[in-house]
């Protein structure tokens, strides 16, 4: 009798176990899918093509932007501004932001096919940079710089007029110097004798022909990007180089500030700047860059893969964060930024429309 009772209890327990298993377990026809605890954010790469002279401030804007946008990596691609534009207009490379050291390149080369709006957001000026180890560093001034550059053994340079705005602006400054210092041999002595760059005059306008510069590379050196010359100054490969003031400040270079009449910094002398222009290569032909105050421009190209994020990057650039960074890096911001074309609604409150 006891055995029968025990057997019955065991059978009951087994039945309960089987029933419980059937309620909570799986059968051969069932599969179990784990419930995800979190979905990883999709990694986004925001591509920014920008002038080499913007490298310093843009690295800081990049850090601020990434800190506020989880999952976004900003890829900075510096180059001469003309080359930056050509990557988009001629090579079809996508960029989410395009920032040029010459704002005029955007309406001239990108609007309307590759962009339908742009902003002017910062200013600059041309300076002559050097180091304490440069020849005659203890003698050079804003009054005698062109005489120092002409001395035997002095090595100096500027960037390529065909790829970099600093490059086509440098000979403009030298040509403007002839009128300011009342010496009509400055350009020929410094540039003409050491390269294939020539100047012609018609109706009071001087055209600098620089499509095929061919510098002698002993006295005069020309490099694709102006920032490359910084390294040469620091390494002692050059004594002097033409740069933007912001680049000199960011790289702790010595520099000579020139009169506003010739340094392309002031709208008060815009008419005087316009008396010089540089002819440079464009595709199979040439184009003319007319002297004007140095103003930076930015846009989100039509080819952008992440246009909304591009607009947010521009918003940070022209807002309080970007203004502080630019000011600290020796690149005075334009406040408010100037707006042209179909400026996005998200930027309207930070922009003064110009046309």
UniProtKB/Swiss-Prot annotation:
One of its GO terms (biological process) is molybdate ion transport. Residues 1-22 form the signal peptide. SUPFAM superfamilies: Periplasmic binding protein-like II (SSF53850). PROSITE patterns: PROKAR_LIPOPROTEIN (PS51257). Keywords: Signal. GO terms for molecular function: molybdate ion binding; tungstate binding. Transmembrane segments: none annotated. Pfam families: SBP_bac_11 (PF13531). CDD domains: PBP2_ModA_WtpA. It comes from the Archaea. NCBIfam families: PRK04168.1, tungstate_WtpA. Belongs to the bacterial solute-binding protein 1 family. WtpA subfamily. This is Uncharacterized solute-binding protein Memar_1880. It comes from Methanoculleus marisnigri (strain ATCC 35101 / DSM 1498 / JR1).
